Amino acid sequence: MERQFEIVSAYSPQGDQPVAIEKLVEGINSGKKKQVLLGATGTGKTFTISNVIKEVQKPTLVMAHNKTLAGQLYSELKDFFPNNAVEYFVSYYDYYQPEAYVPQTDTFIEKDAQINDEIDKLRHSATSALFERDDVIIVASVSCIYGLGSPEEYRELVVSLRVGMEKDRNQLLRELVDVQYGRNDIDFKRGTFRVRGDVVEIFPASLDEHCIRIEFFGDEIDRIREVNALTGEVLAEREHVAIFPASHFVTREEKMKVAIENIEKELEERLKELNENGKLLEAQRIEQRTRYDLEMMREMGFCSGIENYSRHLTLRPAGATPYTLLDYFPKDFLIVMDESHVSVPQVRAMYNGDQARKQVLVDHGFRLPSALDNRPLTFDEFEEKTNQVIYVSATPGPYELEQSPEVIEQIIRPTGLLDPPIDIRPIEGQIDDLLGEIQDRIAKNERVLITTLTKKMSEDLTDYLKDVGIKVTYLHSEIKTLERIEIIRDLRLGKFDVLVGINLLREGLDIPEVSLVAILDADKEGFLRSERSLIQTIGRAARNENGRVIMYADRITKSMGIAIEETKRRRSIQEAYNEEHGITPKTIQKGVRDVIRATTAAEEIETYEATPAKKMTKKEREKTIAKMEAEMKEAAKALDFERAAELRDLLLELKAEG
């Protein structure tokens, strides 16, 4: 019997949620490919999307722009759908340094990574769920557009076992080894099996506590049980079990032989090319590395960095689109792009960044040219693989608005909270004025967010506030994701009252205790003060009934004008609704959650060496400036303002020195 999506919640859709749900469902059922949900901060966008999933009954991929946000969405959707398969698929590296080569200093940086076992388990759980049931929601970061093994191969290599089935025990062991399970009778863990006489116990890659016990009677499977791996307690009797491969890059033996032949052919061609061009060191390097990998593949069936040979392993032609998580979904599935104003530019940028790094490795003999095909999807390929998409954002970007001219709005908050009123105050005397406002908020046990334009101003302001006895902390770009979540938690718990930063638009900053957002230098037009970032920043004060925004500015820029008008428009819609329904705004009561254990992001950033401009040639300087300007614009587009500001400062230095 087919399982249905069902929501378990004490709430029913409120405000303009019912209309948004109805329009989105109607659009999906009528075959619309792309829709936009403009949901103001705190209007319950996740609940709306959950109701849409329940109504359309389609497997769904929810894409978030980083691990932290994906973790939050995963927790929320798991609460709404406790009886369905809600899965989590993000990059499984706790720490990741991709392999790279710096020609200027002749430095090769080996790939260095720590794999998070918990996340690896969740990834396997996600892909196996897609082949076993229809009621699947996978919450993924944008890394889901990176190459994965072939879904056909993954499906075909499933070891399917039934009670009463004729099967030789040794044949089962061979099949398990073929799908990357290792025998380990001592340290029994995920991705291994152990043998005791006629009993084979298998620890599936997608589970962390339960294993499968297969009992043989001669050449027949007599019994299948689900067992607690630690205590041995029998949890359930099973008639059938499917053991999915322990790796997503799994290949049949006959395919592996063909792949090895093709890799050898490519190696010969590459060696000929390098030797003809007098690149003897590069030729020696690529031959040594590739021959070692081939030996490992012949003996073990895999090697370190096997994903770099994925084109050969899946027998695809050069330049062919790689397989990704999207290929594991059935044809008729739904994609929800959360915070689309950030995730769409991110998907666009991933291919170019990946190719630039790999091309250097290929040029200098660290990888074969086919490694360039182990890559994320290009934006056009991503578009081709999507079926129906809902873009969700409080400030949809130009691409989304172009794709779907009709925008479905969700402005009213179920709590009756309004978009905050905005004060504009002169820059002269702003710090003293702000200090008075902070003290008022502290007296009421409320919190304050302050956003500045530069790192120096953030640091100076933090030091000044500390000197006058305010409990304040500064949120800067060097702080890693988990630490960031802890700082936000401490702010909510009252360990400090004020948070200062350049980019207060990142995940997890919807804090009900915040009643004041102060925007310094609001009239300095630029990526830090664009209409979209101002609207997002204003939304940070919309979770408290006393929420207010102060913009310190000597004039009203075009971006400020648009942001202020849009906030007023939303506020008047909300006030009219509250009046009509007799609702009094009430601050959200939200428990302070502990840090999610599966969200440690590896933030990968290109660093620029501080080579004095005078030592660079004119051409080198121009090239560096162009590269930094392009990255600065990309960072600004993705609302990563600390990175953009850092690059802006470096650019100014470089131009001044030149």
UniProtKB/Swiss-Prot annotation:
Cellular component GO terms, alphabetical = cytoplasm; excinuclease repair complex
The subcellular location is: Cytoplasm
The GO molecular function terms of this record are:
ATP binding; ATP hydrolysis activity; DNA binding; excinuclease ABC activity
Please list the residue ranges annotated as the Helicase C-terminal domain: 430-596
Q: Give every UVR domain span.
A: 622-657
Q: Which key words tag this protein in UniProt?
A: ATP-binding, Cytoplasm, DNA damage, DNA excision, DNA repair, Excision nuclease, Nucleotide-binding, SOS response
Specify which residues bind ATP according to the UniProt entry for this protein.
Answer: 39-46
SUPFAM superfamilies, per database record: C-terminal UvrC-binding domain of UvrB, P-loop containing nucleoside triphosphate hydrolases
Identify the domain of life: Bacteria
Q: Which family does it belong to?
A: Belongs to the UvrB family.
Q: Which HAMAP family is this protein grouped with?
A: UvrB
Report quaternary structure and partners: Forms a heterotetramer with UvrA during the search for lesions. Interacts with UvrC in an incision complex.
Entry note about domains: The beta-hairpin motif is involved in DNA binding.
User: Which protein are we looking at?
Assistant: UvrABC system protein B
Per the UniProt record, the source organism is: Bacillus cereus (strain ATCC 14579 / DSM 31 / CCUG 7414 / JCM 2152 / NBRC 15305 / NCIMB 9373 / NCTC 2599 / NRRL B-3711)
